[in-house]
Amino acid sequence: MLFSVLIPLYNAEKYISECLDSILCQSFHDYEIVIVDDGSTDNSGFIADSYQKKYPEVIRIVHKKNSGVLLTRRIALREAKGDYILWVDSDDFIKPNLLQSLFEQIQSHAPDMIIYNYEEDSEKVFHSLLIPGDCIIEKSQKDILYRQLLLGRNMNELCTKCIKRSIVDVNTDYSAFSHVRMGDDLFCLLPIIDAANTVVYLDHSFYWSRVVSTSIIHTNSFRCYSSYRTIFEREDQYLEKWFPENSDRNAVRDVFANRVIDCIVQCANTRKMRIKDYLTFVRKIREDETKNPIFSKGNRKLPSLVYQFYYRLFLKKHDLRLFYFIKFVSCISAIKHHK
């Protein structure tokens, strides 16, 4: 079997049928679909079961208690039987010619990985690599992949990667990282990119990503921060390996600082957020950074003047000022949006 299409499923009853239909209508047919239901509380599991009964030779399903998408992905990997794996999120869908296009590249180049573009609801095309046109990237040229992966430039999505299963470590126990609920794609991709020797890039959009609001950040801002902290530590390990004497280390720290400010902004903007809870959250981050001073030492280059200002207020411990300034900026943005 050539392809295993892996779907982590959780509460996607509105979209899972469209997702599965887009795979079942592929022009290339040597594939299996592996669905891992992460304890859905809606009708997602029931809908998936109905498809499995209709296509038992193609679809396999694992139902389990909720443990988060990272551990769900690990189960899907262990269930996969295809020579190559690719991911499809349960609320997204793929273009009808994706598998055929991947097959042609495998026949021609037998790569360890194929990367392609995706679109969002806005019909905006996101280029996974900042390279014009199709290309083959050999091991000696992988620094371009490393930089774009670590600096967060549209390459962190698992859903735009077709990966040779033999280069993926499926046996390592990830249970210690079950708290990683944000950025799990990047967490999974780092060792895979490291192991890939030949990578094909297709400058075509084969994947449609639906923007669905999530409550992960809003329900537990510190969990969001904890995820980013773990991912940053993993990034730093690979950065040391890939660029032992390179200044890119500071750029990665800038990306991490931006993620942390994102968490603080989301926390402050959460509905019915009490100031007391917000202050507790920010102080927890500061306590953590006191123990791990990578973020708090030195100036960071953040993507906007507003975020630079947030960052300075955070470092100076002006937590209340930061809270009210975030609220003010959000109100101004909302007014502009409704004009």
What are the functions of these language-model segments?
Residues 85:
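Short aromatic/hydrophobic "clamp" motif used to bind/position activated sugar donors
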Residues 22, 37-46, 67-68:
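A conserved acidic beta->alpha catalytic loop
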Residues 206-212, 218-247, 258-292:
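Catalytic core of nucleotide-sugar-dependent glycosyltransferases
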Residues 31-39, 60-65, 89-90:
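Short beta-strand/loop segment that forms part of the nucleotide-sugar
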Residues 11-25:
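Short, well-formed alpha-helical segments that are part of the catalytic scaffolds
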Residues 64-80:
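Glycine-rich, basic loop-to-helix element that forms the pyrophosphate-binding segment
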Residues 90-199, 207-210, 214-220:
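Donor-binding/catalytic cores of nucleotide-activated saccharide
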Residues 269-339:
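Membrane-interface aromatic/basic loop that binds lipid-linked glycans or pyrophosphate carriers
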